[in-house]
Amino acid sequence: MIIKTLLASVAIMLIATVNAEYNVAKYCELVKIGTLMPSMISCQDYYICRLNNQPIPVKCGANTVFDKDTQGCVPEAQANCILSLDNPCENKDRTFAPSSKACNEWHYCLNGNIVANGSCQPGQIFDASKNSCIYGACNSDDDDSNSDFTPVLNICDIMQNGQFFGDFENCQNWQKCNNGRLQKGICLGNLVYDTKNGMCLQNDGTMCERTNGMVSEDGGAPDETLCTSSNDGPLPDKLTCSVYYICEQDTTSTPTTYKWIKTSCPNGQYFDVFGDGCLDRAKRRVYTGCNRCEYTTGSTTYWVNAVSNDCTKFSTCRNGRKITNEDGSCNSGYYFNEADQYCNMGDFTNYAETNGACQNYSCNGYDCTTKPSAT
């Protein structure tokens, strides 16, 4: 009776559980547009990563399967499909086995075959030693702050061999799979890894969306050669609008040297590039390219003024980051109003007085100047 009840429960879970594909759109953020990603459900299925990281599902023809390394459909005998791995239910009967796809998923085995698949509750992982779900988090370098994102156990199972790709945690990091082994590196200086071009470049303000703007601790810091006395600075961080740097003496060194000290504005404030310190984020004139979506939290879409001299441009934000590469723009004769969350008709001069992104200024390095208003 107990066994029948267990099998009935598993059957119900199987009916209620859709086959768990990994979050393909999320991993498309790490690769170039046009990259082909394998399915974790069928060897014949794969996805094309398109603009804005939207995957398009495709299926190989008869008697062929997708091979991630050749980026195409090949005869079954020539493929490197991870679903051809040893059966996790081999030699198992009436028990559970961990999934090879994600740490919070499991299989139920009967007579050495998989008869059901399932997922643990949010906040839990499957513990093979206990044959049950326990509270915990996946131990993965590719974990993300979004609670609905479960990383694949081995990212090299889905990434093309020998090709560079980005990192979810740090915008300066790059990764590459060499015969199934993950290799990591970091871009030099203040460069970040641009997944669109597959190389290290100066950040244009859109390259770090996949990491919520997170870079290494000094990723947006000014060059150390600019810190030679306590009179230097403060200078803004190039990537995080709320961060700035103060040049202070390094008391641990002989002879006397100076180093930048990373400092953060209070919550809700940005650092002003004209040296006026921290103030309400809307009023500050920030370094062009820093993340103005910072402080927009939650899954609700929100729009903020992008730096522009005519106040027409706006960025689309969610969870503290831009979700589109290109900024939107109001029609001629309109300006974007953050408080109203839409484009208003008329002159923006009064609005610009208390909204720094609309004030006409430009920066050459850290030398910023104002210009006559564009009305």
UniProtKB/Swiss-Prot annotation:
UniProt-recorded name of the protein: Peritrophin-48
Lineage start: Eukaryota, Metazoa, Ecdysozoa, Arthropoda, Hexapoda
Disulfide pattern: 60-73, 120-133, 187-200, 265-278, 330-343
Entries under InterPro entries matching the protein: Chitin-bd_dom (IPR002557), Chitin-bd_dom_sf (IPR036508)
Protein modification: Glycosylated.
Glycan attachment points: 117, 360
Entry GO terms, CC: extracellular region
Function: May bind chitin or related oligosaccharide structures.
Keyword field: Chitin-binding, Disulfide bond, Glycoprotein, Repeat, Signal
Tissue: Cardia and midgut peritrophic membrane.
Stored PROSITE patterns: CHIT_BIND_II
GO MF annotation list: chitin binding
Organism, as annotated: Lucilia cuprina (Green bottle fly)
Domain Chitin-binding type-2, residue spans: 25-83, 86-143, 153-210, 224-292, 294-360
Signal peptide: 1-20
